């Protein structure tokens, strides 16, 4: 047996269905395209996935809601529980010390929130602080200084 003598079994290869070649062929007349419409025509008949046939599309029917203020201040927030965990009694807490311990990311002003308890004295110098956090720090004997923003 040689390579040129190999051939597939009798039933293994089916002839390709030739479309549009007479009514008796099973794929004659409309050639599987149905009747009329963009997809039955010749040429490029791809339709954009969001096109709904001329009906106002969904993304235009859904109402527009709200807006984003360009003046909104976004803070790097940190809770008292994290300060209690990462700093010792009498430590000064500033943006730089928080960055050094990887508790905040660079570029945003820092705000301290009041979740957690404080047992150590901290000297806190940050851009903003919640009233509950300020009360807890001062009750523990610490001090709070709010820094003024450069642009204000």
From Swiss-Prot:
Residues 1-14 have a biased composition (Basic and acidic residues). GO terms for cellular component: cytosolic large ribosomal subunit. One of its GO terms (molecular function) is rRNA binding. The keyword Ribosomal protein applies. Residues 21-35 have a biased composition (Gly residues). Residues 1-55 are annotated as: Disordered. One of its GO terms (biological process) is translation. It comes from the Bacteria. Keywords: Ribonucleoprotein, Ribosomal protein, RNA-binding, rRNA-binding. The keyword Lipid biosynthesis does not apply. NCBIfam families: rplO_bact (TIGR01071). Part of the 50S ribosomal subunit. Belongs to the universal ribosomal protein uL15 family. Binds to the 23S rRNA. PANTHER family: 50S RIBOSOMAL PROTEIN L15, LARGE RIBOSOMAL SUBUNIT PROTEIN UL15M. HAMAP family: Ribosomal_uL15. This is Large ribosomal subunit protein uL15.
């Amino acid at each position: 047996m040689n390579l040129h003598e190999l051939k597939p079994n009798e039933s293994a290869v089916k002839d390709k269905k030739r479309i549009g070649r007479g009514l008796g062929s099973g794929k004659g007349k409309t050639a599987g395209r149905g009747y009329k419409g963009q997809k039955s025509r010749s040429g490029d008949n791809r339709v954009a996935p969001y096109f709904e046939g001329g009906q106002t599309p969904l993304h235009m029917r859904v109402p527009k809601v709200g807006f984003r203020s360009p003046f909104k201040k976004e803070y790097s927030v940190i809770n008292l529980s994290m300060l209690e965990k990462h700093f010792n009694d009498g430590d000064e807490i500033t943006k730089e010390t928080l960055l050094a311990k990887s508790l905040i990311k660079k570029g945003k002003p820092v705000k301290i929130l009041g979740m957690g308890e404080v047992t150590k004295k901290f000297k806190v110098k940050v851009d903003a602080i919640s009233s509950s956090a300020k009360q807890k720090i001062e009750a523990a004997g610490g001090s709070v200084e709010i820094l003024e923003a450069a642009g204000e």
